[in-house]
C-alpha cells in the first residue's frame, strides 16, 4: 500500500534550505532566488510536431466555428422571402461547400503527413505513443467536424427539395382576380377618356343613357356564362387528373428526398472508411519498412556468418596441414 510522504519531503527540503542559508551557500541565484535548482525544469528541446499539431487543431476549430456561425443562413432555403436570414445566396452556399471540402481534405493530408513524419523520426516508445494519441485525437476531431458539415448539408438539400415541391404546388392566379383587374381597367379607361375629352362633361345625361343599355346587356350575358353539367363534369375530371399528377409528383419528391438523405449518409460513411483506409495503408507501409530493415539486418548477419565460417575452415585446414607435417617429421626422425 502506498504511503504519503509529502510532509516528510517538505521537511527535508526545508532542512536543506536552512542549512544552506547557515553555510552561506547561494541557492537558485542567491538567497533571494526565485526558485531552487531542484525544482527547475530541465531544458527540453521543442520539436516542430507540437506547433504543427496545434496549428491543425486551430484550423479545424476555425472551420467548426465558421459552420456554426453561418448555420442558420446556410440551411435556410427561404432566405429570399425572410429578411432575418437574407444575408446568403445559393452561390455563397455552394462556395462554402467547395471551400469546406477542400479545407477538410487539406487537414486530413496534414494529419497523415504528421503521422508519417512521427513514424520516421527516432524517439522513445513513450514519445511515439504520445504522438499517436495526439494524432488520433486530431483525426477524431476532424471526423466530428465532417459529420457536422454533412448534417448541415443534408438539412440544406432537404429544405431545397421541400422548397421546390412547394413552388410546384402553388395555385395559379384566380380567374376572378383577372376579371376584377379587367373591370378596373375598363373603369379606368372611361376616366382617361373623360380627361382627354372635356366636351363630354357637358353632356352627362347622354353618357348615362349610353351606359345603361351596356350594363343591361352585361347583366344578360352573365346568365349566359353559367356552366352546363357536361362542362362541370369535364372540369371535375380535369381537377381529378391534376390532383393525381400532384400526388405522383409529391411521391417522387419524397423518394428523391429520401435518396438525397441516404446519399449524404453514405458519403459520411465513405469519408470515414477512406480515413480508416489511409490509416491502415500507413500502418502497412510502416510494417513494410520494418520488414525491409529486418531483411537488411538478416543479410548482414548471413554475410558475417559466411565470413566466420570461412575463417574457421581456414584454421581447420591449417591445423590438419600442421598435423600432417608433424607426423611426417616424427616418422622421419624415428627412421
UniProtKB/Swiss-Prot annotation:
**Which InterPro entries does the record match to this protein?**
Syntaxin-18_N, Syntaxin/epimorphin_CS
Quote the function comment for this protein.
Answer: Syntaxin that may be involved in targeting and fusion of Golgi-derived retrograde transport vesicles with the ER.
UniProt-recorded name of the protein: Syntaxin-18
Query: Which terms in the GO cellular component ontology are assigned?
Result: endoplasmic reticulum; endoplasmic reticulum membrane; Golgi membrane; SNARE complex
Subunit architecture: Component of a SNARE complex consisting of STX18, USE1L, BNIP1/SEC20L, and SEC22B. RINT1/TIP20L and ZW10 are associated with the complex through interaction with BNIP1/SEC20L. Interacts directly with USE1L and BNIP1/SEC20L.
Q: Does the record bear Transport in its keywords?
A: yes
Q: What ranges are annotated Cytoplasmic (topological domains)?
A: 1-309
**Pfam families found in the cross-reference section:** Syntaxin-18_N (PF10496)
Q: Which GO terms describe its molecular function?
A: protein domain specific binding; SNAP receptor activity
Disulphide bonds annotated for this chain are none
Bias (Basic and acidic residues) occurs at 168-182, 192-208
- Protein localization: Endoplasmic reticulum membrane; Golgi apparatus membrane
Domain t-SNARE coiled-coil homology positions: 243-305
Q: Which family does it belong to?
A: Belongs to the syntaxin family.
Transmembrane residue ranges = 310-330
Chain ranges on the Vesicular side, renumbered to this chain: 331-335
Q: Name one GO biological process term.
A: endoplasmic reticulum membrane organization
Chief location of this protein?
Answer: endoplasmic reticulum
Cite the record's tissue specificity text.
Ubiquitous.
> Gene name on record?
STX18
**Keyword terms, alphabetized:** Coiled coil, Endoplasmic reticulum, ER-Golgi transport, Golgi apparatus, Membrane, Protein transport, Transmembrane, Transmembrane helix, Transport
Give the membrane topology, semicolon-separated if more than one: Single-pass type IV membrane protein
Q: Where is this region: Disordered?
A: 168-226
